[in-house]
C-alpha cells in the first residue's frame, strides 16, 4: 500500500510540475506555437528517416520533442506522437518493439525497482534499433524499428555489416533478436566526448545508397531475445557463445538503485566501444512475445544521462550596467540542471552581441557549462512565434559616472558597491549584490562610501539583512577603515591594475593628485592612453569630492 501511495504521489507531483511550466498563452497562440514546432520536428523526421541526414543535434531534437509534448499536455487533451518513423515502413516485426519508459531520477528508479527482482542493468547504447530474424541458422530478415509494429526492410544493408552475425546455431538458429545498430568507437568516454550525434550518423549510413564500405564502421548490441531462455545468465551465455559477446560483457545484475547509480557513473567515465546516453534496467522475467506492444513494456526502464547541454526557455531579457558603465545583457531562464547545477541565468554579453544572437523571451536556447561551471549559450534552437524584445537603456554611462546615487544611476551604482566589497578590493565578507541593494534601498546612500556611516542599530533594522549577521557586517565595515591606501584608491575605480598601482609607490591622496601623465605612463603595463585615463579620473569632480569625504573620515592616506 505504501509503495502504491508513493507512486501516486510521484505521479501527482509529475503532473503538477507539468502544469506549473505551462506557458501563459492564449488558445490561438498555443495552437500556432505547437503547430510551428510540430512542422519543424516533422521536417527533421523526414530528413532523418527518408534521406538519412540530420539537420539538428540528437540532444536538441530529443529536448525539443519533449518540449512539444509538454505544450501538448498543457493545451491539447491527447498529445499526438509526432515521431512515427519510418513513414513508408511496411515490414511487420515478428515481435513488436516496446520502447522504454524513462525514469526522471534515482528516486523514481528506486520506486520502480522496489517491487521487482532479478534485475539487470545494461548501457543504453545510442544508435538505431533493429530486429534481427534468424531462420534455420541464417539471417533471414533485418527490420528497422519504425513505429514499433512495422519498419523498413534493412536486410540487404545489415548483411553488409561484418560485425552482425550472418549465421548462428543452437538455440539462436530460429530466433528473433532486438538490438541497437551503433557506430563502433575505440575508447569512447561519454563524460568527455558526449554523444557526437551518433544516432544521426548511424541512420545516415543505413539510409544512404552505395555506401557498403562505410557500413563496416557499424556493429550491433543485442538487448532483447524475446521468448529466449528464462534465466538471464543462460541468455547471456548463449548470445556470447554465438558471437554476440558485448551483451554478456555489458550486462550486470543489480539489486537496488544505488548499485545502478554506481554502474551508470562507471560507464559514464569509462572507455566504451560505443556511444551511450544512459542505462537500461530490465527484469529477466518477460512476458511472452505475443504480448509485446509499443509503449507497454513494464519490465524495463531507462535512466538517461543528464545532457551536457540543455534546452532552456528564455523567460526575460535583463540589462545590467557594470562598474565601468558598460551595458551587459542577461537572459533569465526557466530553471534547468547542468552537472548538478541549477541554471536560471546566462550572460549574453554586450547589447551588440545580444542583437547578433537575436534572442527574445519565449525563445529556446541551448545552454552548457563553460570553464569553472559558468553557464554559456551555445545556440538558439527555436524562436517563438510572437517575439517582443525589450529596449536596452541609453548608453549614457562610462567609467566616470555614478559614484553618487541617482535614479538613473541605480545599476552602475550597485555594481560599484559590489566591486569595492569584493575580496580583491576592500574584502567586505558576507555581503553581495542583494545585500547592497537592501542597504541602499533602506538608507539611501549618497555615494559609494556612505555605508561607512551606518550604525549597528541601522544595520540590525535593515530589511533583507539578517539580524544575526548585522553585527558581523558592521565589524567588516569598521575593519575596512584600516585597509591600505591603494585598496581605497582601487575602490574609487582608478583605471590601473593592482600591479601598476603598487609599482607607483603612491601612499597618499595628495601625492597621487600631483603625479603627472608622464609619471603614470612609465608604470608597467600603462601606455599613454591609460595614463590619460588616470589624469581624467583624478581630475573628475566626483572623485575629488570622494577624496575629500574620505579625508574627513580619517581614512589612511587621505588625511590633509
From Swiss-Prot:
Name of the coding gene: ligB
Role according to the record: Catalyzes the formation of phosphodiester linkages between 5'-phosphoryl and 3'-hydroxyl groups in double-stranded DNA using NAD as a coenzyme and as the energy source for the reaction.
NCBIfam families: PRK08097.1
GO MF annotations in UniProt: DNA ligase (NAD+) activity
Active-site feature positions: 124
EC number: 6.5.1.2
Family: Belongs to the NAD-dependent DNA ligase family. LigB subfamily.
Protein name: DNA ligase B
Superkingdom, natural source: Bacteria
Catalysed transformations (reactions): NAD(+) + (deoxyribonucleotide)n-3'-hydroxyl + 5'-phospho-(deoxyribonucleotide)m = (deoxyribonucleotide)n+m + AMP + beta-nicotinamide D-nucleotide
Keyword set, alphabetical order: DNA damage, DNA repair, DNA replication, Ligase, NAD
Pfam families in alphabetical order: DNA_ligase_aden, DNA_ligase_OB
GO biological process: DNA repair; DNA replication
Signal sequence range: none
Species for this entry: Shigella flexneri
Amino acid at each position: 500500500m505504501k509503495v502504491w501511495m508513493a507512486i501516486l504521489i510521484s505521479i501527482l507531483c509529475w503532473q503538477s510540475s507539468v502544469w506549473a511550466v505551462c506557458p501563459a498563452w492564449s488558445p490561438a497562440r498555443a495552437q500556432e506555437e505547437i503547430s510551428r514546432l510540430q512542422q519543424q520536428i516533422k521536417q527533421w523526421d523526414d530528413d532523418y528517416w527518408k534521406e538519412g541526414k540530420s539537420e539538428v543535434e540528437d540532444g536538441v531534437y530529443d529536448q525539443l520533442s519533449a518540449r512539444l509534448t509538454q505544450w501538448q499536455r498543457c493545451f491539447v487533451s491527447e498529445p499526438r506522437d509526432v515521431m512515427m518513423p519510418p513513414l513508408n515502413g511496411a515490414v511487420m516485426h515478428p515481435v513488436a518493439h516496446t520502447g522504454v519508459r524513462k525514469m526522471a531520477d534515482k528516486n523514481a528508479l528506486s520506486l520502480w525497482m522496489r517491487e521487482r527482482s532479478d534485475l539487470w542493468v545494461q548501457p543504453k547504447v545510442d544508435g538505431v534499433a533493429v530486429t534481427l530474424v534468424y531462420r534455420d541458422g541464417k539471417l533471414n530478415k533485418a527490420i528497422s524499428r519504425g513505429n514499433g509494429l512495422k519498419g523498413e526492410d534493412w536486410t540487404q544493408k545489415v548483411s553488409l555489416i561484418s560485425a552482425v552475425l550472418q549465421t548462428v546455431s543452437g538455440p539462436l538458429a530460429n530466433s528473433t533478436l532486438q538490438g541497437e545498430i551503433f557506430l563502433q568507437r575505440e575508447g569512447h568516454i561519454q563524460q568527455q566526448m558526449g554523444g557526437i550525434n551518433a544516432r544521426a550518423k548511424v541512420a545516415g549510413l543505413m539510409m544512404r545508397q552505395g555506401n557498403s564500405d562505410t557500413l563496416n564502421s557499424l556493429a550491433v548490441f543485442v538487448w532483447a531475445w524475446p521468448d529466449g531462455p528464462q534465466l538471464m545468465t543462460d541468455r547471456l551465455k548463449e548470445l556470447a557463445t554465438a558471437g554476440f559477446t558485448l551483451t554478456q560483457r555489458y550486462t550486470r545484475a543489480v539489486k537496488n538503485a544505488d548499485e545502478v547509480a554506481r554502474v551508470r557513473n562507471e560507464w559514464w567515465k569509462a572507455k566504451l566501444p560505443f556511444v551511450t546516453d544512459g542505462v537500461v534496467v530490465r527484469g529477466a522475467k518477460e512476458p511472452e512475445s505475443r504480448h509485446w506492444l509499443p509503449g507497454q513494456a513494464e519490465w524495463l526502464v531507462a535512466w538517461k544521462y543528464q545532457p551536457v547541454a540543455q534546452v532552456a526557455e528564455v523567460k526575460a531579457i535583463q540589462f545590467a550596467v557594470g562598474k565601468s558603465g558598460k551595458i551587459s545583457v542577461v537572459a533569465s531562464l526557466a530553471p534547468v540542471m547542468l552537472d548538478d547545477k541549477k541554471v536560471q541565468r546566462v550572460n549574453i554579453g554586450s547589447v551588440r552581441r545580444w542583437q547578433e544572437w537575436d534572442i527574445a523571451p519565449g525563445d529556446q536556447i541551448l545552454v552548457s557549462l563553460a570553464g569553472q561551471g559558468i553557464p554559456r549559450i551555445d545556440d538558439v534552437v527555436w524562436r517563438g512565434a510572437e517575439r517582443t524584445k525589450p529596449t536596452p537603456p541609453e548608453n549614457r554611462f562610462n567609467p566616470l559616472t555614478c559614484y553618487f546615487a541617482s535614479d538613473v544611476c541605480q545599476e552602475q551604482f550597485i555594481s560599484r558597491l559590489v566591486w569595492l566589497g569584493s575580496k580583491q578590493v576592500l574584502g567586505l565578507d558576507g555581503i553581495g549584490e542583494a545585500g547592497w541593494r537592501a542597504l541602499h534601498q533602506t538608507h539611501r546612500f549618497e555615494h559609494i562610501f556612505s555605508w561607512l556611516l551606518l550604525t549597528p542599530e541601522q544595520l540590525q533594522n535593515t530589511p533583507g539583512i539578517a539580524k544575526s549577521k548585522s553585527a558581523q557586517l558592521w565589524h567588516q565595515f569598521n575593519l575596512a577603515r584600516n585597509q591600505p591606501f591603494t585598496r581605497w584608491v582601487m575602490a574609487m575605480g582608478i583605471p590601473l591594475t593592482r600591479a601598476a598601482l603598487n609599482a607607483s609607490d603612491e601612499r597618499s591622496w595628495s601625492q597621487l593628485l600631483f603625479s603627472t601623465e608622464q609619471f603614470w605612463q612609465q608604470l608597467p603595463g600603462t601606455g599613454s592612453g591609460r595614463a590619460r585615463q588616470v589624469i581624467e579620473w583624478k581630475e573628475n569632480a566626483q572623485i575629488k569630492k570622494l577624496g575629500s569625504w574620505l579625508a574627513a573620515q580619517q581614512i589612511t592616506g587621505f588625511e590633509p
